[in-house]
Amino acid sequence: MLEQIRGPADLQHLSQSALSELAGEIRQFLIHKVAATGGHLGPNLGVVELTLALHRVFDSPHDPLIFDTGHQAYVHKMLTGRSHEFDSLRKKDGLSGYPSRSESEHDWVESSHASAALSYADGLAKAFELTGHRNRHVVAVVGDGALTGGMCWEALNNIAAARRPVVIVVNDNGRSYAPTIGGFADHLAALRLQPGYERVLEEGRKAVRGLPVIGEFCYQCMHSVKAGIKDALSPQVMFTDLGLKYVGPIDGHDEHAVESALRHARGFNAPVIVHVVTRKGMGYAPAENDEAEQMHACGVIDVATGRATMVAAPGWTSSFSEALIDYGAKRRDIVAITAAMPGPTGLSAFRDRFPDRFFDVGIAEQHAMTSAAGLAMGGLHPVVAIYSTFLNRAFDQLMMDVALHKLPVTLVLDRSGVTGPDGASHNGMWDLSVLGIVPGMRVAAPRDGARLREELGEALDVNDAPTAIRFPKGDVGEDIPAVRRHRGVDVLAEPADGLSDDVLLVAVGPFASMALTVAERLRKQGIGVTVVDPRWVLPVPEVLTEFAAAHKLVVTVEDNGLHGGIGSSVSAALRHAEVDVPCRDVGLPQQFFDHASRGEVLADVGVTDRNISRQITGWVAALGATPADADEVSERLD
C-alpha cells in the first residue's frame, strides 16, 4: 500500500482499516530502512498515526506543517513522495534526516534546533493575514520536551494574542510530564471534542451575562469555579489561561481519534492546542524497551535485536565522561549541567554517580548558562556539557552573565567542527569564532584522549574566568605523544636532520594527526616542518609567536570556519608581536554544508593531507624557501 502513496491526496480515500494497515507498513519500512542507514528511529515510530491524520486533515503545502526539531519528519517525507529515497537517508547527495526546503515544497523549515516551530508558525500566520490568505492554517508539531524551551512560551504569548488559525500539536510522549488523568479531566476532554461545545459555551455566556443585575456576577462565579476545577485536575490550564483553545488529551496511536480532534481544532479558526499522547518507539520492541532513550537515534543496527552491528571504538564523549567522574570524585565543588541531553553529552554516568550535583535544565541553553553563573557565584565549579552548535543559543548569557563576572564556568563543547550526517544545523564550526570575542575566555582543543583529560583538569583549576574545551564527534583515536613541551605548547614533530625550519604547522585539536601526515609528505620533498599543538588555542599562546619567528612560513589547520578562527587569531598575534612572517590558514569556508560523512565534507572543501601538502608546497615555493618548482613538486606529491 505504501508504494501507492505519492502524495497527501492519496490518503483521502482510504478507510480506517486501510489506514491501520498503512500505519503498520510504515513502521516496518522505518525499522528496516533506518536499521540500514542509522537515524532517528524512536521519534518517528511514535508519530505514524499523527502524521497520517495531519495530512488527511490539512492541505499541505497550502497549510504549512512545521515540525519542531524535525527529527520526527520521516513519516512526513514518506507521505509526500519520498519513500523511494530512504536508502540514501543521511548520506551524501541523499535524503536529509530533517525537513529540507530543497527536497520538497512540503518542507517549510529545515533548521533542526528545538523550540523554534511556534515562532515560525506565528510569523507565517501573520504573513498570511497581511497578504490576504486568511483561509490558510498553520500547523506546528512540537514535542513536550521542546516545550521546556523558553522560546516556545515567548511564541505562545504572541500567538494567543490574536485569533489567527494556528494549530499547535503537542506530541507528548510522556518523557517530560505525565498525561492528564482522572474521570472529570476525561469528561472535560470529551466535551471539548464535541463539535458544538464552543458554540454552546458562548451562547451560555451570553445568556448568563444577560440576566438583570446579577448576570455578570453569576458568570464570574461560574467561570471561577470552572477555572478552579481545571487548575486542580488538568494541566491544560497552562494553555487556556493564555487564551488558547485546548483539545485533548488524545491517544496518538488512534488515527481516527487524532483525525477527529484535528478536524475540530481546524474548525475553531483560532489558536488551539491539540494534546496528543504518543509512545516513542511504538511498535518496535527494542525501542520500547530502551528505558534510557527509546532509540531516539541509532547507528546501523540488527533489526531483530536493535543492537549495533559494529562495536564502537572509544569516543570523545565517553573519554570526557570518564575523566569528569574521576575529577568529580576528588572535588565536591564540581557540578554538571545539561540541556536535556545527559546521554549524548556524556553526563549520564556523572548523574548516576553524583545525582545531587547534576542538573538537567531541559532544552534551555540560555537558562543553563546563567544558572551556571549562579552556581559559580555560590562557590561551585559548573561544567556545562553542550553540543557546539547549541552554544550559539546562549551567547549573550555567556558574555554578560558569565564572562563579565569572571566566573569559573567550564563549557564542554561536544560535536565541534564538522559532524557530518546531521547536516548544516549540527555542524559545530563556529565555536572558535564566537568564543574568540569573549573577554577573558580560555579555549582548549585536545588532540587525543590523554590531552582531553589533562586539559579538563587544567580548566577546572581556573577560578577567575570561563573556560571551554572543544572536541569532535566520533572515535577519539590513539594518543599522540609530544616530542617535547615548551611553555605549555606541545611540539609534535621537528625538521629532520639537514632540513631548515621552513614551516611552522599549527595543528588545532584532532587535526594534529593530519598535520603529522602532512609534515611527513613535505619532508620527502625536502621541506622542513615543525608541528605544534598549542593545546590552549585561545588566547593565542605568546610562545607561539616566538616559534613563528624562527620559521619562514606559518600555517594553521583547524576544524572551524576561517572567518574569526584560530588562523585569524594567530595572524593578529603575529602582527601585534611585530613578527614579520607570512601566515596562511586552512579550515572551513563560511558556508552551510549539506549532510554527508565528516570525511566527505572535509574532502569537498579541500581539508585533506594531500591537498594541504600541495598548498604548502606552493606557498613555500612562492617564498623562495626551496629551489623546487611548485607545480613540479605538486605533481610528485600526487
UniProtKB/Swiss-Prot annotation:
Mg(2+) binds at D144, N173. One of its GO terms (cellular component) is cytosol. This is 1-deoxy-D-xylulose-5-phosphate synthase. Thiamine diphosphate binds at H71, S112, H113, A114, G145, A146, N173, Y284, E365. GO terms for molecular function: 1-deoxy-D-xylulose-5-phosphate synthase activity; magnesium ion binding; thiamine pyrophosphate binding. SUPFAM superfamilies: Thiamin diphosphate-binding fold (THDP-binding), TK C-terminal domain-like. Pathway: Metabolic intermediate biosynthesis; 1-deoxy-D-xylulose 5-phosphate biosynthesis; 1-deoxy-D-xylulose 5-phosphate from D-glyceraldehyde 3-phosphate and pyruvate: step 1/1. Catalyzes the acyloin condensation reaction between C atoms 2 and 3 of pyruvate and glyceraldehyde 3-phosphate to yield 1-deoxy-D-xylulose-5-phosphate (DXP). Its EC number is 2.2.1.7. Belongs to the transketolase family. DXPS subfamily. Keywords: Isoprene biosynthesis, Magnesium, Metal-binding, Thiamine biosynthesis, Thiamine pyrophosphate, Transferase. It comes from the Bacteria. Its cofactor is Mg(2+); thiamine diphosphate. Homodimer. It catalyses: D-glyceraldehyde 3-phosphate + pyruvate + H(+) = 1-deoxy-D-xylulose 5-phosphate + CO2. Binds 1 Mg(2+) ion per subunit. Binds 1 thiamine pyrophosphate per subunit. HAMAP family: DXP_synth.
